[in-house]
Amino acid sequence: MSEKANDWRALAASEDTSAYGPQRIVCLTEEPTEWLYLLGEERRIVGISGYTVRPPRAREEKPKVSAFLSAKIDKIVELRPDCVIGFSDLQADIASQLVRLGLQVTIFNQRSVAEIFSMMYQLAAMVGQEARGLALMQAMQNRLLAISQAAATLKRRPRVYFEEWYDPHISGIAWVSEVLGIAGGDDCFPELAAKA
């Protein structure tokens, strides 16, 4: 938190809700980075995943401090984040190390389209951008609805195999299966997506 945020009296007197949220964020995965840029809150980001591709300028502007399963713990600590944001049990060891070093860590575990929107809202709220976040999310939901309606007119639904990774084989991801359905396709392995 900023110095202002550490002074509860200043917060109580302020109408600026963004001061309550984290001011120095490290994003261990790509999604929070892209979302914070869309919210116009990129100034808060002090470190990103090396896998970040959107927006392209993030790779030029922000130091890369993590892969998906590993992180440069010393570099993250040097950046003095007041919040580190990660994803799923796969980053639990990273989160545990950072918590033991006294850092605030928020791990999301979004697995479905609804959970992705929930994560997006929570992150928008963390940085005082609930209204902007809701507006962006509504536009995205309207696009998904339009795609779904257009897909409903297709004469046939193609069966789709989606492989996220080849070694080990990773398939059957719930949100991917949902998106395939929205777009008019059927996941080849819906039973795997149901377990994800």
Language model: regions and residue ranges:
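N-terminal ligand-binding lobe of clamshell/alpha-beta domains
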Residues: 1-196
